[in-house]
Amino acid sequence: MLTDESLEFARQHIFWFYDTDFYPKPFEFKAIWHSWEEVKKYLISTPIQQLQTTNPKVLPWLKAKGGYRVVHQLEPLDALIYTALVYICAADIEQARMVPSVACSYRISPTDSSFFALGSGFPLYRNSCELLSSRHNYVLSTDISDFYNQIYLHRIANSIEAVSTIPKIGSTIESFLMRLNNKASQGIPVGPAASVVLAEAILIDIDQFITNNHVEHARYVDDIRIFSDSLEELEEILERLVIYLHDQHRLSLSGEKTSIRTTDEFLHEELQNQYQLEKLEILNDIEAGNPYEIYEEPEDADALDDAEDNTSEDELSQTLLDALVRAKNFGYVDLAVLRAIIRRAKSQKIPDLAELILTDIAFFRPVINDVALYLDSLPSAALLRLKKLFSSLCSDRKLESLSTRVWMEWLLTRHPDLLQEPAIRKYVYSGNTIAASSAAIIQKNQAWAKQAKQNLLSLASWNRRASIYSLSALSNNEKNKFISHIMQNPTMTATDKWVCKWVKDGCPELGLVDLHDIFG
């Protein structure tokens, strides 16, 4: 089922972008790229149902308006498989979708590495809503409750096989996701870009159903806006939609997000109110491109931004700082605005936002991934000036939420000067094995690596591989001898062995020459 083309796409997608939006990219991918031809041969020659899959890692992620959603990170090999499988049917799914003015979100246009070369589609959604509001008197606003977690996998298979020319691709994806879910038949991973494609597949017949009721609508993911000149007609359609979603998908609408308003009220309350106007003003001030891009921001995007920016650093720094203060004064987290500001600061390596963000780190938890990536982009001297603030945050337990810990551990273990601070070092080494291993490597902490050898084979997958990685802190003789020993153990998985080979070979990174050879 997996092909050379689909796996090459998955490789480039994960290399240039991310495996999930909510976790740092794991080091295991470096090991996989190091043995890529062997990995690819293994995945192509092994039937999908015989490939070992493991439940994803999960995090509670704070929503902008309170409450949590569960987000995921797949095992590295599972992430490759998932991306490759969805790539196989992505073009067929896009072909079956309604026109972009209706199904606005994430138009699927695969390139060599991206599912969504045309962007998120949010500006198109906004324009469609404004146009339809000018034509009609009323609008029904609604969205699907807990959408990703409520999707039935069998419905995904049916939706794909109804539109795809690839035999059994839908049932193959269903079976793969069932194994990821430990046989649960409901829910797709939150975070991977491939899940966005599957969500749009599910929504194909829902768009068709609304159109069959002879009304106009616009949809952005699971946010639906239906327009009519009749209040009564919208009430009837709402009832029909509730039944259709239940009967065909076992989905339900969010009561608190469902309303019927005049289009004038809708425009004023949702698109053209004072808050929205100020928000657009902020985005214009910082020259943000598309602030609604959640998935697929390339890791080399900074270079593109650098080439296009003619604003002086001091001017841009003050503009971004002012924008951040104004955004905080909204009184709640606006994900689009905060992401746009922080990503703009990251692209230009502007350090002046860092202290403001860190002193109110709890406010920024819904965008903690962007915060960490921004801080990591700063010059070493700028980070060093923040060492005491980081230390205080660690001592005062301000970085203990699970999502914050994942990203702050990743950040702090990339900067050895920060680890010289006792409170920071204690924070990192008292965390999970992955963080401690990363710290041991960057600090060349042989004692930690030697201890890690003692129970390495009894550890679960992520921690086992992290401990293998930490062996790079040891002498070549000790490292290679131990790796040769554990490679004979029958509990070692294929990914374990590729990590061993990578560590034994000195943990090489892909250089510019390698990239040219690989990607042309």
Can you annotate each of these PLM segments?
Residues S230-L231, E265-L267:
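Short secondary-structure transition/capping segments
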Residues F116-V221, R225-I260, K279, N284-R465, ...:
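Conserved polymerase palm-domain catalytic core
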Residues M1-P167, M178-P192:
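Conserved two-metal-ion catalytic palm core of "right-hand" nucleic acid polymerases
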Residues L267-L280:
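Short, low-order "capping/linker" segments at domain edges
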